[in-house]
Amino acid sequence: MRNYFLIFLFVPLVFFGQITLDKAPEDFQLFPRDASNNASVVFSGKISDDVDKELKLKVFKDDLLVFEKTLEIINKKFEISSIIKAGLFQYRFELYSKKGENEYLLHKANNVVCGDAYIITGQSNSHASSKKSTYSSSFARSFGVKTGYETYNQDDKKVKWGLATGNCKTCKGERWETGYDGGWFEKVSHGVGVWGMELAKLLIEKHQIPVSIINGGSGSSTIEENMLYPEKISLETSFGRLAYRVDQAGLKNNIKAIFYHQGESDTYSDLAFFKGRKRGIYSNYSENFDILKNDWQRVYKGLKKIYLFQIHPGCGSDFQSEIREIQNEISKKYDNVEIMSTTAIVGHDGCHFSYKGYKEFAKRILPLVSRDFFGERNDKIITPPQLINAYYSGKNEITLTFDQPIELEEYYELKGVRHLMKNQFFFSIDQEKPSIYSVINRLKAKNNEIIISLNTDQKYSSLSYIPNKYYFNTKDMYKGPWIIGLTNKIGALTFSNVKINN
């Protein structure tokens, strides 16, 4: 990032003239910590006249002077730096021009911190705001304006560093007031969304490190709309607007992780449109994710992890099961991609989540971030249950093996109807899309296995867990029952058209 500050000193020009700063900290800026828990803050620039001068830098940590250095200007150029430490304290920088015993303030930056930087992006569930999101912290930061699809205009470019928010001051109307509108298409300065704000809160409280989150989500966006088009960064695209903000924040090479919640808009089998925008075709998702991941790693050089949320049954078209399975496969393909389920999260309305539900996103993903970036060792299992094998264990018996102990919810009652767990598995004879229903006599969970007793001698080739989005033969959105982790109570990852081994 190169910001230019022209400082005209209102004293006789024979002493001072004009100084240009090409590097200087800004108010509320977060500097990314290095492996030693430090960051270097640099002032550099040049002076336009020929009078010899001295500069003095003063650094205050929580208002206590901790560093002071005088520097001579040589050949009209100067550079001076100071090391700051990561932690829950704030720095103030004051740069002075010195002539004799007199000091003249050139630049001041308040509330500067050192910590970690993350990105959240995707479609609407990546950036939902809520009037209930009132938490604010001096150590939770963001940069610029979350704009969605709107052009990043000149006024937006004036918005620099500030305190992150999960709220939306410009949102209004009955749906907003009652919690059914998350400000999906509103511009929000320093907006990080409900669960982004909750994640920042949990990280700050647990690890005592400041956090910056930049959210680039766009409501209803396809994976294509999150990709880098064209090859150069453009403010006309979601990718470009996000990359611009990250670059201007000086974080391009220091993003630790990207959290990606997206896929509902890619559940179509052929060309379709929503509000005039092209929808995504599910069969292209895996290849497109490969491209997106490569572009992220090319633009954000320091990227270490990608946290991918498997989508919940909800808004979208008829191939949600396929997208969820593709997301499973993506997580297995890449060592630096971690997947998290959204099953068994409360408050799903058929497309989005309640305030409480979004907070659960942050609660689930926190232990993974703590493990990956803070070296936390956890005796508990912190990942969602994932199927590792399905096989015939008897003539009329199929065993499903998971990577951890699980338990089953027996049923979910909706509108007076009990939807039984045993009816949420679907089978196929020829490995086409599983659609054979109600062939299970009983289910039993035992440690990390589910034992399925069939009521037929028919041999099946594959099975799926949970329907595409509706309960079978209804228009009621699926809300459970769920397979959940026995110890962590995290909903299992769904699976689709998985081969049943003999």
Task: Mark where each language-model region is.
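Cell-envelope and extracellular/periplasmic
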Residues: Q18-N502
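Bacterial Sec-dependent N-terminal signal peptides
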Residues: M1-T20
